[in-house]
A protein has these predicted regions:
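Membrane-helix interface residues
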Residues: 75-78, 112, 189-191, 215-216
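Residues that define the loop-to-transmembrane-helix transition and helix capping
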Residues: 3-4, 78-81, 159-162, 191-192
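Short runs within selected transmembrane alpha-helices of multi-pass transporters and secretion channels
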Residues: 6-23, 56, 60-64, 87, ...
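Alpha-helical transmembrane segments of multi-pass membrane transport and lipid-handling proteins
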Residues: 122-176, 203-215
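Helix-terminus/linker motif at the lipid-water interface of multi-pass membrane proteins
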Residues: 61-92, 110-111, 147-157
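Short helix-kink/termination motifs in transmembrane helices of multi-pass secondary transporters
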Residues: 50, 54, 58-70, 74, ...
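Interhelical loop/hinge segments that connect adjacent transmembrane helices in multipass membrane
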Residues: 3-10, 21-65, 69, 107-122
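Helix-loop junctions and terminal segments of transmembrane helices
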Residues: 29-31, 90-128, 182-187
Length: 216
């Protein structure tokens, strides 16, 4: 029950933060209050984009949540705790790299508007090389340091096999490359063209979870 209160507290805190931010922004920039009405076509287009963005985000939330739910339901909390220890290390490194994507999104969006398609394509190739290099270096470190660190941290009794570490590393690399393309997708607002992929990925991930959990 305490955990449920904790989750509700997170939700309430986020709502309060959003409301406070809106109030502060209105006071700091009163001259930017919207006036007039939008055309029906513009409203419909905005609704389509919001719906497609919502679908995209829901798909990625399901992907991240399905693993935890399936492991806890089929293998128990002990296996889930071991998995979460490994995933905690992985996600911590991913958060550091996420700073790069977050800081570049606005600049990428501006470049898509004001620069040529050739310039944006060249930038995408440079970003792809940079993220591939950073992710590759992290992947090599994971392969060599994951197990020794986990042995020092939790002991041999609470460790996964090396095969699981390889799976974590593959997941990490794919996620980082995918985040780059998602950054460009978010910056350019092309969620409609890609609206089904997150749902297909989420469904595939759930099916593979239910299938592979039987081989644990």
């Amino acid at each position: 029950h305490n955990y449920y209160y904790y989750v509700l507290a997170i939700l309430a805190t986020q709502i309060i933060t959003n409301i406070s931010t809106a109030i502060v922004v209105d006071k700091m920039y009163p001259r930017y209050n919207p006036e007039g009405n939008l055309d029906k076509d513009e409203i419909q287009q905005i609704n389509h984009k919001i719906r497609d963005l919502f679908t995209s985000k829901i798909g990625f939330v399901v992907v991240d949540s399905a693993d935890t739910i399936v492991i806890s339901a089929f293998l128990g909390l002990t296996a889930l705790a071991i998995y979460q220890n490994y995933f905690y290390i992985l996600s911590s490194v991913m958060e550091f790299i996420a700073v790069v994507f977050t800081s570049c999104t606005a600049g990428i969006g501006n470049s898509i508007i004001v620069e040529t398609a050739e310039k944006n394509y060249n930038d995408l190739k440079k970003f792809t090389f940079l993220i591939s290099w950073i992710s590759g270096m992290c992947l090599c470190c994971f392969l060599n340091l994951y197990q020794p660190f986990m042995e020092l941290w939790v002991g041999k009794d609470l460790m996964l096999s090396m095969g699981a570490v390889v799976c974590f590393c593959v997941y990490f690399y794919i996620q980082e490359i995918n985040k780059l393309f998602n950054t460009y997708k978010d910056a350019s607002g092309i969620w409609h063209e890609d609206r089904f992929r997150p749902l297909v990925v989420a469904l595939t991930n759930l099916c593979l979870n239910l299938l592979m959990v039987n081989f644990w």
